[in-house]
């Protein structure tokens, strides 16, 4: 999927209860917000930088959202079990948007 540069603000998150999700930075680095399974607060939000050529796997139940990038656009590979985006996807959101700095 193509990831475009956008403001570093997040509020919505998704999780998959039965499926891991792997994200691989193909043409440039990506930043991904993560939070522990269950209820979480903005203080428990973590942003990880994944450099070009590297990837990260998200265990079932871990909250995450679409990648961000420092570049104009990059390509990112997203890998999960077939039909996960229809059959094993749950959403939550924080009360207010949260910004992050590098």
Regions found by a protein language model. Give the residues of each.
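Non-catalytic, conserved peripheral segments adjacent to functional cores
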Residues: 1-47, 71, 80, 85-88, ...
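Conserved metal-binding segment of the jelly-roll/cupin
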Residues: 49-68
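Short, surface-exposed ligand- or partner-binding patches at beta-edge/loop junctions that are enriched
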Residues: 74-75
């Amino acid at each position: 999927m193509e990831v475009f540069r956008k403001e570093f603000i997040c509020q919505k998150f998704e999780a998959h209860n039965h499926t891991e999700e792997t994200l691989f930075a193909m043409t440039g680095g990506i930043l991904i917000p993560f939070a522990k399974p269950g209820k979480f607060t903005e203080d428990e939000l973590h942003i990880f930088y994944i450099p070009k050529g590297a990837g990260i796997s998200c265990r079932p139940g871990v909250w995450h959202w679409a990648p961000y990038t420092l570049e104009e656009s990059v390509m990112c590979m997203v890998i999960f079990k077939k039909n996960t985006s229809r059959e094993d996807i749950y959403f939550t959101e924080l009360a207010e948007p949260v910004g992050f700095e590098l």
